Curated annotation (Swiss-Prot):
Chain intervals with Gly residues compositional bias: 14-23, 345-360
Residues that bear Phosphoserine: S48, S51, S135, S625
Free-text description of this protein's post-translational modifications in UniProt: Ubiquitinated. This targets the protein for proteasome-mediated degradation.
Name of the protein in its database record: Far upstream element-binding protein 1
Modification sites for Omega-N-methylarginine: R316, R354, R356, R358
Natural source organism: Rattus norvegicus (Rat)
Positions of region (Disordered): 1-27, 40-88, 341-360, 442-527, 543-574
GO molecular function: mRNA binding; RNA polymerase II cis-regulatory region sequence-specific DNA binding
Gene, per the UniProt record: Fubp1
Major subcellular location class: nucleus
Comp. bias regions, Basic and acidic residues: 61-73
GO biological process: cellular response to lipopolysaccharide; hematopoietic stem cell proliferation; positive regulation of gene expression; positive regulation of Schwann cell migration; regulation of transcription by RNA polymerase II; response to nutrient levels; somatic stem cell division
Cellular localisation: Nucleus
Pro residues bias spans: 463-500
Length: 639
């Protein structure tokens, strides 16, 4: 048996024999823990540790403690080795670096816009991520993950989630081009118009921002109420970005949580603001040849565009694009312009004028300035471009400009059959705006027939009545630059137009020459002078001369005109003066000698047509006001 007399006890301060056994058990426990830690680090678990190597001097564990269980082996009070092992192990674990592969096409999605995505991953996992600058032509790219094992595993998990989220979904396939992919997402039917936008503006902006191609697929133009697939084609990462942008657009617009300015538009970025413009005032904002809107754009440093619409709303939306402060300045300029027009209107605005951001109000004001009329001609082949299918184009132009546009079905005499006459009625601004829209449709300028003519005191159209004397001239201005002295046109199949200052068709183009007014000195050279003389004699005498007594036995037979068309008989109880009027015209025609050498039948004879017209007028005025129109022809002059 070994001699242990020279070995000092483990602890001199222990009382009794039980204290030494407890210390030995604690030492055994510490030794066992050290072996376990060494095994984790990579050492041999069976290697025994020499206590002398760790500063225990000549202390030796008593042999009697060898058979004690490990649970009683605790480290001694002066054991510094056991306290240092956990920090050493933690320090070794914090410098772990691992290479991780990610798909090359998903790198941009992992990094995110402005590096937001990768910054979030590093912050949540506590792991540093470094991505190789390129893949070297391989389908995967290397990422170096540095951190503790737990942080590295967390970073891997987050990266896998992002890659899985960006993987092709059902309906996603690679396109024909290299690196292109196609994905289809379903858009609710109620949001399809929101994604497309007015005139396709929204979907174009999405394509430009994401760098992809988007196509909304639908079976036909009719709205079936079913969801529509949106096909996105492009780089896989860009396709995913475009998908997120579309979903964000639908989500934002559906919630109506945008911050809006005083004009009701969203604020932020360079999106600009939308300003509602009364439809009749659109021409005022645009100005003649676009001068006003160009001036506003130059002064404010913005871009102004009118959004297309269906013409059902009373206002049109002017979209102002640019910096927020400049957009606000341009909106104020437009508002001031409209206010000045409103204040200058003779009728004045109605109650509740439009306030800036304080309700919509109501203009209740007519178009500024007097109504004018503008005639122009276009080649027959381009008439369809102005009218459109079912009249949609001309209706749209009329709604956008606020002017009334008509195609004259009955052109003036001697008109060129290859040209068509159009008439625009409205304010100068409306006429100018409508003219611009028409010129855009036909791809060139129109051929005007004189400046716009205002409706003066005699300017209210009537039911195909005879023309009156020309109304007073209009003051010269930007929309009426030249003096204008029109003459009455020749008689038309349905009678002359109403008594207003008519435009002359012969002052601009020779192929629309009009008939000159009758001149007494040249009466012998005009075959229609008899009709004009009768007309003027009747016109100037209808108010001054009282109607004479109706002669007895006046004929009431049915007459026919020179073209063989049967005329309607006079109403029952009314006196028919058709024969008397015909005799009057015949006498007037015989009083004026025909020019020498004039070919017979060179000009049509409208005597019968005029007689029928005056007979109808006599019947009409006799029913409404017996004193309103003379019931007999004037006495032939010079007879």
């Amino acid at each position: 048996m070994a001699d242990y007399s020279t070995v000092p006890p483990p602890s001199s301060g222990s009382a009794g024999g039980g204290g030494g056994g407890g210390v030995n058990d604690a030492f055994k426990d510490a030794l066992q823990r050290a072996r376990q830690i060494a095994a984790k680090i990579g050492g041999d678990a069976g290697t025994s540790l020499n206590s002398n190597d760790y500063g225990y001097g000549g202390q030796k564990r008593p042999l009697e403690d060898g058979d004690q269980p490990d649970a009683k082996k605790v480290p001694p009070q002066n054991d510094s080795f056991g306290a240092q092992l956990p920090p050493m192990h933690q320090q070794q674990r914090s410098v772990m670096t691992e290479e991780y592969k990610v798909p090359d096409g998903m790198v941009g999605f992992i990094i995110g816009r402005g590096g937001e995505q990768i910054s979030r991953i590093q912050q949540e996992s506590g792991c540093k991520i470094q991505i190789a600058p390129d893949s070297g032509g391989l389908p995967e790219r290397s990422c170096m993950l540095t951190g503790t094992p737990e942080s590295v595993q967390s970073a891997k998990r987050l990266l896998d989630q992002i890659v899985e989220k960006g993987r092709p979904a059902p309906g996603f396939h690679h396109g024909d081009g290299p690196g292109n992919a196609v994905q289809e997402i379903m858009i609710p039917a109620s949001k399809a118009g929101l994604v497309i936008g007015k005139g396709g503006e929204t979907i174009k902006q999405l394509q430009e921002r994401a760098g992809v191609k988007m196509v909304m697929i639908q079976d036909g133009p009719q709205n079936t109420g079913a969801d529509k697939p949106l096909r996105i084609t492009g780089d896989p990462y860009k396709v995913q970005q475009a998908k997120e942008m579309v979903l964000e657009l639908i989500r934002d617009q559906g919630g109506f949580r945008e911050v809006r300015n005083e004009y009701g538009s969203r604020i932020g970025g360079n999106e600009g603001i939308d300003v509602p413009i009364p439809r009749f005032a659109v021409g005022i904002v645009i100005g003649r040849n676009g001068e006003m809107i160009k001036k506003i754009q130059n002064d404010a440093g913005v871009r102004i565009q009118f959004k297309p619409d269906d013409g059902t709303t009373p206002d049109r939306i002017a979209q102002i694009t640019g910096p927020p402060d400049r957009c606000q300045h341009a909106a104020e300029i437009i508002t001031d312009l409209l206010r000045s027009v409103q204040a200058g209107n003779p009728g004045g605005p109605g109650p509740g004028g439009r306030g800036r951001g304080r309700g919509q109000g109501n203009w209740n004001m007519g178009p500024p300035g007097g109504l004018q009329e503008f005639n122009f001609i276009v080649p027959t082949g381009k008439t369809g471009l102005i009218i459109g299918k079912g009249g949609e184009t001309i209706k749209s132009i009329s709604q956008q400009s606020g002017a009334r546009i008509e195609l004259q079905r009955n052109p003036p005499p001697n008109a060129d059959p290859n040209m068509k006459l159009f008439t625009i009625r409205g304010t100068p601004q409306q006429i100018d705006y409508a003219r611009q829209l028409i010129e855009e449709k036909i791809g060139g300028p129109v051929n005007p027939l004189g400046p716009p003519v205002p409706h003066g005191p005699h300017g209210v159209p009537g039911p195909h009545g005879p023309p009156g004397p020309p109304g007073p001239g209009t003051p010269m201005g930007p929309y009426n630059p030249a003096p204008y002295n029109p003459g009455p046109p020749g008689p038309a199949p349905h009678g002359p137009p109403a008594p207003y200052a008519p435009q002359g068709w012969g002052n601009a183009y020779p192929h629309w020459q009009q008939q000159a007014p009758p001149d007494p000195a040249k009466a012998g050279t005009d075959p229609n002078s008899a009709a004009w003389a009768a007309y003027y004699a009747h016109y100037y005498q209808q108010q001054a001369q009282p109607p004479p007594a109706a002669p007895a036995g006046a004929p009431t037979t049915t007459q026919t005109n020179g073209q063989g068309d049967q005329q309607n008989p006079a109403p029952a109880g009314q006196v028919d003066y058709t024969k008397a009027w015909e005799e009057y015209y015949k006498k007037m025609g015989q009083a004026v000698p025909a020019p020498a050498g004039a070919p017979p039948g060179g000009q049509p004879d409208y005597s019968a047509a005029w007689a029928e017209y005056y007979r109808q007028q006599a019947a009409y005025y006799a029913q409404t006001s017996p004193q309103g129109m003379p019931q007999h022809p004037p006495a032939p002059q010079g007879q």
